[in-house]
Amino acid sequence: MFNENPIKRRPSTRIYVGNVPIGDGAPIAVQSMTNTRTTDVAATVAQIRALENVGADIVRVSVPTMDAAEAFRQIKQQVKVPLVADIHFDYRIALKVAEYGVDCLRINPGNIGNEERIRAVVDCARDKNIPIRIGVNGGSLEKDLMDKYKEPTPEALLESAMRHVDILDRLNFDQFKVSVKASDVFLAVESYRLLAKQIKQPLHLGITEAGGARAGAVKSAVGLGMLLAEGIGDTLRISLAADPVEEVKVGFDILKSLRIRSRGINFIACPSCSRQEFDVISTVNELERRLEDVTTAMDVSIIGCVVNGPGEALVSHLGLAGGHKKSGYYDDGIRQKERFDNDNLVDALEAKIRAKASLMANRIPVQEGDAD
């Protein structure tokens, strides 16, 4: 395929969040965050499991109080995905969740107290092999930086991040990743570009408070797409005012569109016009709903007529080109004799897609030099 792998990743160090490798060429991890009350253990566990089901690699949980820390202990015991504890101000909460098996601490060392408290948290993280995420946000910059720069700027976010990085450097702790998020696309992008030149640690990408499901997805795709295309980024979160499950789906869609990492089916579908021989939109929507559980990476083209249908099918694992009453079917770009009745497309396509996905998932790669 044209330009199969055009992106050269920024070199970075390697850390582990639980069993998930981050940086140094590891697959870019997709993260989300719960929006339940952490003290509601049942609701939080249910949401984390829903995120696990759609492929979330890491889930962040806010832990604002000691009661939440005790709830975190119960939550951690009931889920498989690595958990990041989001903590501000009270260093004792960080120490407590470390006891309970947290996989990563999201803290800013400079806002959890004096040097003794910072050292206590860092020493605990070191002893238990827990990485730290430094999280700088354009909406919560330090007062002196706002006085200096008058408003959030890339330089202000960079300076804030480097303050926290310097603290960890002085304590000889290098197992961390950093984010410099902002709600403005250009502010976030330039901040990450500056930071990428300053440190070797992994970077966690995000456009913070991006908005609702539609606008937030677009804003995140634009901002993160710019950075990812430049090779910047090792983990990401799509921040939406929506169900966190949608954050994970959008995250994978962005990675999929850049051919960085694929999970599940990439539907190539026409917007439809008067040439369509079947209802493309309802067909695609129903297939997406039915096939959410398929994790095999594959391209499926569904085109409503023969103008572009055969061409798209040529570069898809499976393809459909609309025809009068019956539509043409392609497998690995090859036209099949079998044709599908336009009144029964969804059932027929679902069966073919599931069979193809199973075949691809179980395919044994041929080693170079193997005989036929």
Curated annotation (Swiss-Prot):
Binds 1 [4Fe-4S] cluster. One of its GO terms (molecular function) is 4-hydroxy-3-methylbut-2-en-1-yl diphosphate synthase activity (ferredoxin). Coiled coil: none annotated. It holds the Pfam family GcpE. Keywords: 4Fe-4S, Iron, Iron-sulfur, Isoprene biosynthesis, Metal-binding, Oxidoreductase. It is an enzyme of class 1 (oxidoreductase). Its cofactor is [4Fe-4S] cluster. It catalyses: (2E)-4-hydroxy-3-methylbut-2-enyl diphosphate + oxidized [flavodoxin] + H2O + 2 H(+) = 2-C-methyl-D-erythritol 2,4-cyclic diphosphate + reduced [flavodoxin]. [4Fe-4S] cluster binds at C270, C273, C305, E312. InterPro entries: Dihydropteroate_synth-like_sf, IspG_bac, IspG_bac-typ, NO2/SO3_Rdtase_4Fe4S_sf. One of its GO terms (biological process) is terpenoid biosynthetic process. Pathway: Isoprenoid biosynthesis; isopentenyl diphosphate biosynthesis via DXP pathway; isopentenyl diphosphate from 1-deoxy-D-xylulose 5-phosphate: step 5/6. Its EC number is 1.17.7.3. Converts 2C-methyl-D-erythritol 2,4-cyclodiphosphate (ME-2,4cPP) into 1-hydroxy-2-methyl-2-(E)-butenyl 4-diphosphate. Belongs to the IspG family. NCBIfam families: ispG_gcpE, PRK00366.1. This is 4-hydroxy-3-methylbut-2-en-1-yl diphosphate synthase (flavodoxin). The gene is ispG.
